[in-house]
């Protein structure tokens, strides 16, 4: 009888211990992203989150990323049909997130009200850029302009001024000196093609894009490769480059400059939780972490800008944050400046396939390296 009592006590102790461990694990022990966001950013974000989860939540989280260009990532999510191999989709145009939500392939983010309310509904005029989904299926994480990257010494040798506006890329002296990624392969290129079409109208816009292709010496396989070939001095300028990709080359020691022309599209780097995600609690915790000052600092130190007016890019003299401010023209927050935007999400969504088809027929099919 005494042995039975000891055995029962042992079972009760084990049950209580197990319950205690469960109570101390508020989130799952794994998190996987599928993302076009470069390793430079997503590795830092995942590492910072894992440290935060251990420190603040008492949880050991194994973090993983599936790198994929935006069109490829979108296609894989559709193919998974609600049984995803990742928990989160991060990066690209918000129009794609809207399409995934329509197909019921996203679940609502359902983060805390404080975190949700810290992000304004939109930014920019005359066309506001949504910074979060009105129906709650995605949320912005950082502001990222798509602009022009250039090699100052090569530009100087060509005898032209440093580019400031999109039209500067059409200078005849830049023939064969521009690098870009096809809009069929890159969301930043696709969005910037949309900007040009919105600025000039369909006919004049395509004329402009054809002229750009005549100055293009290389169509890269990925948008990430555009600043790399410019930084190495293989080309003088790059079109539709995300700010952080250019800054990564600057940190690597290359002589490279960056400018966001008027009407440069500013993406909120959307993030969403996939329907059927195996680790939804960890996914929500990751999103909430990224919206804290600690999470936003991951971006602010790497050439991106805060998604909330609460924070500004700043740091000690000589810090990477201050280097980023200088590199991006003195910008500390996009909420402190006028943001001119002509990109229309509804038009972009409707025109998406037609744009890609016309690019293939009017530019890709006839392009020859100058």
PLM-predicted stretches and their roles:
Residues 274-340:
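Mature extracytoplasmic/periplasmic domains
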Residues 66-75, 95, 167, 213-228, ...:
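Short helix-initiation/N-cap motifs at beta->coil->alpha
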């Amino acid at each position: 009888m005494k042995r039975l009592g000891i055995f029962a006590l042992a079972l009760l102790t084990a049950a209580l211990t197990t319950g205690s461990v469960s109570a101390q694990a508020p989130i799952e022990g794994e998190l996987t992203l599928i993302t076009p966001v470069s390793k430079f950013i997503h590795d830092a974000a995942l590492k910072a989150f894992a440290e935060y989860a251990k420190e603040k939540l008492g949880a050991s989280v194994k973090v993983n990323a599936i790198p994929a260009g935006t069109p490829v990532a979108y296609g894989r999510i559709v193919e998974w049909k609600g049984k995803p191999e990742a928990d989160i989709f991060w990066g690209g145009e918000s129009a794609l997130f809207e399409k995934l939500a329509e197909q019921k392939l996203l679940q609502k983010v359902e983060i805390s009200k404080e975190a949700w309310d810290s992000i304004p509904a939109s930014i920019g005029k005359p066309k506001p850029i949504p910074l979060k989904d009105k129906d709650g299926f995605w949320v912005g994480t950082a502001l990222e302009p798509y602009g022009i990257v250039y090699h100052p010494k090569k530009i100087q040798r060509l005898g032209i001024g440093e580019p400031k506006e999109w039209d500067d890329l059409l200078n005849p002296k830049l023939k064969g000196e521009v690098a870009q990624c096809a809009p069929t392969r890159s969301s930043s290129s696709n969005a910037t093609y949309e900007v040009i079409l919105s600025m000039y109208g369909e006919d004049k816009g395509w004329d402009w894009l054809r002229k750009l292709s005549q100055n293009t010496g290389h169509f890269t396989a990925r948008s990430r490769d555009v600043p790399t070939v410019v930084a190495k001095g293989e080309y003088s300028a790059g079109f539709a480059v995300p700010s952080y990709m250019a800054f990564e080359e600057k940190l690597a020691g290359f002589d490279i400059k960056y400018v966001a022309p008027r009407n440069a599209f500013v993406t909120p780097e959307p993030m969403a939780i996939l329907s059927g995600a195996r680790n939804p609690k960890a996914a929500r915790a990751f999103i909430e972490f990224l919206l804290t000052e600690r999470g936003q600092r991951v971006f602010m130190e790497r050439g991106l800008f805060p998604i909330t007016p609460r924070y500004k890019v700043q740091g000690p003299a000589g810090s990477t944050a201050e280097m980023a401010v200088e590199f991006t023209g003195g910008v500390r927050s996009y909420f402190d400046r006028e943001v001119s935007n002509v990109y229309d999400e509804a038009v972009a969504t409707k025109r998406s396939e037609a744009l890609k088809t016309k690019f293939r027929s009017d530019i890709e099919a006839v392009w020859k390296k100058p």
